[in-house]
Amino acid sequence: MGVSDKYVRKVKVSCASLRSYTVELRREVIKEAFDKILKKIKILVNIEGVLIRGEYKGSILMLSPKGRIAIIKGPEEEKLKEFLDDLFS
């Protein structure tokens, strides 16, 4: 069990060719998860209470306050777990 298992409820591949994923967080730890993520990403856009767009390890992350994260140009599918574990560590 990795670090990300505490925070991640479900992961879906949005587009395999673009390495895009949708990550759904566990409701009970959304705030804690966002606090960890915000310490690690470079914030590009912050529309207060609507969307945060940031960059992490060459990938674009879009965080919604409802606990969804879109990852664009993310790691290969086999390395996604490692990427998420590092993001939440």
Which residues are covered by each model-predicted region?
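Short, compact, well-ordered microdomains
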Residues: 59-89
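Acidic, aromatic-enriched beta-alpha/helix-loop junctions
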Residues: 40-52, 86
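Short Lys/Arg-enriched alpha/beta "domain-start" segment
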Residues: 1-45
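Short amphipathic beta-strand starts and helix->beta connectors
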Residues: 5-9, 47-59
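A generic structural signal for well-ordered coil/turn residues at beta-strand boundaries
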Residues: 17-19, 48, 57, 65
